[in-house]
Structure formats: C-alpha cells, structure tokens
Amino acid sequence: MALKLKRIEVEEKLKDLGLEVFTPQEFKGVFNVSLKRAANFISSNLRSGLFVKLRNNFYTIKDSHPDYFFIANKLYQPSYISLETALSYHKIIPEVVYGNTSITTKTSREFETSIGNFTYRHIKTEAFTGYELREVDRYKVLIAEPEKALADYLYFVDLKKVSLNDRLKLRNIDRSKLIEYAKMFKRPGILKLINQIYVDARKPPKIY
C-alpha cells in the first residue's frame, strides 16, 4: 500500500532538507513516490494553498517560503542578484525596490508569481563575475559585489534599457574596481557614465 502523504509532514520535511523551492522530480525522490503521484499531490496542494507555482516545474511553500534572493537564485540558473535589487541591498540607491532583479548568461526572462516578480537580464559570459556568496536571512545567496552591481546597472543604462538614478551613493564604492568591471562590457559609454556619476556626486544635492 502506498504511504499517505500528509501536508504538515511534507512541509516539515521539505524545510528540513532545504527544499523550500523544489521540482516534481525532487519531490518524487524525497518522498519515494512515482512522478505521477508527486505531480498529483503538488497540483492538489496548489489548489488548497499549501504550494505556490513559481514557473513550470518550480514550486515553493506559500506561507513559509524562503528569502526572495534565494528563490531568485534557484528559479533561473545560472544567475546572481544584481542591478536595482543589489544596489538597494548595498545602500547605493536609497529607494526600496519591489521585485527582484538578477543577472544571467541565459535569455532574459521575467516570472510573475503571487509572491513577487523575478526579472533576469542577460549579459555575456565574459562579464558574468563579480558576485559573492552571502548569508541573507539564514540562506546562502549569490549577490553582486557593490561595484559589480553598479557596473551591471550602468551597462543597461548605456543600452537605454533603464534610466540613470540621480541619487546614487558612491561613498563606499571602489572606483578602480568599478572601472575594471565596467571594462568587461567593452562599451566606452559605461566609462563615460562613471565619470558623469562622480561629477554629479560632487554637486549639491537637489531639493525635491
């Protein structure tokens, strides 16, 4: 007789194993059930509200899902947290950012879910560096260093994909390191933007 899967026990085991973001294949292996039974249990508990679908074949626990940075890392790989999300995390921009932005070497994608939006922007493989493993809310996540987050951001400003934020906080940025990361993109416009933001940083703050 097949073992009956109980919601509470399933939730606790997924948490204990660090599988708060999981696929049907992983669920099948953990609970030693057929792929069909795993899919049926997940489908049933999407309707009941235990699980949330993040994208095709990726799910999380609705009421106790892990940190958004951790979800972003797992949802689309390879990737690391960067751009506005990392700039806010490192306090380079003052705004609170809603949604999560990451860098990937794969095709740019966006996933809209009931727990938040996850955006991934493509860069070339040669520039896919400058990130580190950090502990955020008990989870180990890949996130851009401050200088790389800014270099990534200025790359997309130069491409006219995003607007330049006029309230960048550069006090803790290593300018030489920023320039080295910027050179990886081989776009002279990024170096001009770096000069511009440092000139702007010396001006008196605007009164809004």
Task: State what each model feature region is.
Residues 1-3, 207-208:
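Short, low-complexity, intrinsically disordered N-terminal peptides in bacterial proteins
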Residues 2-78:
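Short beta-edge/loop segments at beta->alpha junctions of small alpha/beta modules
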Residues 62-208:
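Nucleic-acid-binding surface
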